Regions:
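Bacterial N-terminal signal peptides
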Residues: 13-28
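Gly/Ser/Thr/Pro-enriched helix-cap/hinge segments flanking short amphipathic alpha-helices
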Residues: 34-40, 58, 376, 418-421, ...
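Blade-edge beta-strand/turn elements of extracellular beta-propeller
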Residues: 41-44, 122-132, 173-185, 254-266, ...
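Repeat-based blade/solenoid architectures
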Residues: 50-71, 108, 130-145, 184-195, ...
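Beta-propeller blade termini
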Residues: 69-79, 116, 141-154, 169, ...
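Hydrophobic beta-strand segments that make up the repeating blades of beta-propeller
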Residues: 85-89, 152-161, 207-211, 283, ...
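Short, conserved, GDST-rich strand-edge loop motifs in beta-rich repeat architectures
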Residues: 88-107, 211-240, 401-419
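Beta-propeller blade signature
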Residues: 110-118, 243-251, 301, 357-358, ...
Length: 574
């Protein structure tokens, strides 16, 4: 029997109990946070007709999978210029899951859901019409990736889960077809986050899949204390072996080849939860960061020859500054300080702080968690999906985190912690982060998990859609972020992949302020976001330069671009 006080505490329970019984950390969610008068986020879920409730099918057996889902995506599946919403769901579990029993998604309550945005901004559930309803027994959905893998101009969906993944091809007529078997991307085991990227710059999107632990209903263990002395709890991942990640190469004919072993991805084993992509060393090839849960995080350097080298330890991002592992969950790989080099942020459990690694430009990263203000603002929280985006369009990327402890029993063993937590927003002021409360939703507690980001109403500021464990999803509209000027950039590749994923964009505003972006859909936790880039311009009415470095190597420039519009850029032939 394993003792669990916090999720990590079964190994060192007395230490964690005594540490927190004497800790002087406020559990008030509003203490030490600043209010922001100019920008508010408004919960508009009900008025948009979004009625999704995540069904994790919690049981008394504390099956580990119950506490880990679900994800979401913001993407325009029908090319009408309006973002649509996809949310993943769990499955019906029996209590207990007897030999031979499988998760069951046949009941509509457990379906993943696709919501199409109407012309008036409301949404209609089109799941069944789109061919995305139900699923045979044995499948429990986790995350979602978005990308146009066949370059036909329509965004496809890849849904991860327990005991198999699904690739849905977008037919271009409002429907999807399950092509998993033909494509050869079914995976296996417990897959978590996934993302499309072009690792060999051949113009076709490849697919990276993170996998968590080698767990099954049969191997699920009893963790915690037996009643009446204590309560049963979800087991720490140390109770289970890790799994290898999967790299699928796009063959260009609708099929993929598993290149994990040949490319150097299959070793070592990890406990992957989040994945993100960026070219951290500027060599023109996209690298991969995997957030692992309580084992070393992985940074896969792309060698440019179809192989990767795992350099997390050497680069300084495998462990925290004390040389310890942490419970890596959500991840973003983006330039927070506008120096042209993508940095790494990783969410974590309470007591540990979220990690921020600054890219030093020499292949190394420096842990700036405390110096940046992120450490002090996050010590008492547990974070999942995260994203660096400029919510107030002042030119600095701010940090959002969907939050909740992983243990629904945490308050019984650690009274200073909370299971339900409000989302977190840290405002970036010239590279230093301070917590802000931009509206009532940031004082409301949820079981946050996945979150996706994008401009739902095309007004130039970023909105948020979050999927909450066992709760209703929410949509937060950004009200006031467009008071500052902004420039949206939507690109289409010709020689490069059609989505332009992996393209690097530099924006120089009229005053000379410079920002850098990487075109991506994958980041956070189990989720996929709008591929369009939004650059906050502050009071500047123009961008004097927009420079796009395509994955093909082509460099494209636009000059004197007016603010408050979406610039549409098509990759030139040379």
């Amino acid at each position: 029997m394993s003792r669990v006080l916090s999720r990590r505490g079964w190994r060192t329970g007395f230490f964690w109990m005594t540490m927190w019984s004497g800790a002087v950390i406020s559990t008030s969610f509003t203490s030490m946070a600043q209010t922001v008068a100019d920008v508010r986020f408004t919960d508009i879920t009900s008025q948009l007709h979004i009625d999704f409730t995540h069904q994790n099918s919690a049981t008394s057996n504390k099956y580990l999978i119950e506490t880990m889902g679900g994800g979401g995506a913001l993407f325009d599946y029908d090319n009408d210029g309006r973002l649509d919403i996809f949310l993943t769901n769990g499955a019906l579990l029996s209590d207990p899951m007897r030999d031979g029993a499988n998760p069951d998604k046949s009941d509509k309550r457990y379906w993943n859901r696709l919501y199409r945005q109407n012309a008036d901004g409301t949404f209609t559930d089109v799941t069944e019409r789109a061919g995305l309803s139900g699923r045979p027994q044995g499948y429990y959905s986790m995350g979602v990736a978005v990308g146009d893998y066949d370059n036909d101009g329509f965004e496809d969906l890849y849904v991860t889960g327990y005991e198999g993944n699904i690739l849905y091809h977008n037919n271009g007529d409002g429907t999807f077809t399950d092509v998993t078997e033909k494509a050869g991307v079914g995976g296996g085991g417990w897959s978590s986050s996934a993302g499309f990227f072009d690792y060999d710059n051949d113009g076709k999107l490849d697919l990276f899949v993170t996998r968590y632990v080698d767990w099954s209903f049969k191997t699920n263990r009893y963790c915690g204390e037996k009643p009446p002395l204590g309560v049963r709890a979800y087991c720490h991942p140390d109770n289970y072996d890790g799994m290898t990640n999967i790299l699928y190469h796009n063959n260009g004919d609708g099929t993929f080849t598993d290149m994990s072993v040949k490319a150097g991805i299959a070793n070592p084993r990890g406990k992957g939860l989040g994945v993100a992509f960026a070219d951290y060393d500027g060599d023109g090839f996209t690298d991969v960061f995997v957030a692992n849960d309580s084992v070393q995080c992985f940074l896969y350097h792309n060698n440019g020859n179809g192989t990767f080298s795992e350099v997390g330890l050497l680069a300084g991002v495998g462990y925290n500054e004390d040389g310890k592992t942490f419970a890596g969950m959500g991840i973003d790989f983006s330039d927070y300080d506008n120096d042209g080099r993508p940095d790494i942020v990783v969410t974590d459990l309470s007591n540990e702080r979220y990690m921020l690694f600054h890219n030093e430009g020499n292949g190394l990263f420096r842990d700036v968690t405390n110096a940046s203000g992120v450490g002090g603002a996050t010590l008492a929280f547990s974070g999942w999906s995260t994203h660096l985006f400029d919510y107030d369009n002042d030119g600095w990327k701010d940090l959002f985190v969907a939050q909740s402890h992983v243990m629904d029993t945490i308050e019984k063993t650690s009274p200073n912690l909370r299971y339900l937590e409000p989302p977190l927003l840290l405002r970036n002021v010239s590279g230093h982060f301070t917590r802000v409360l931009p509206g009532e939703p940031f004082q409301r507690a949820w079981a946050g998990r996945g979150a996706a980001f994008g401009d739902l109403d095309n007004d130039g500021d970023v909105d948020i859609v979050a999927n909450n464990l066992g709760q209703k999803a929410y949509v937060l509209r950004n009200d006031g972020g467009d008071r500052n000027n902004w420039l949206g950039i939507q690109i289409m590749g010709t020689k490069s992949n059609r989505d332009g994923i992996g393209a690097r964009i530099k924006v120089v505003s009229a005053s000379g302020f410079t920002q850098y972006f990487t075109v991506n859909t994958a980041a956070g936790y189990l989720s996929a976001s709008d591929k369009r880039v939004i650059a906050g311009l502050g009071k500047d009415a123009t961008a004097k330069l927009v420079e796009i470095r395509w994955p093909s190597g082509i460099v494209q420039k636009f000059e004197d671009v007016k603010a408050r519009q979406y610039l549409k850029a098509v990759e030139p032939s040379q």
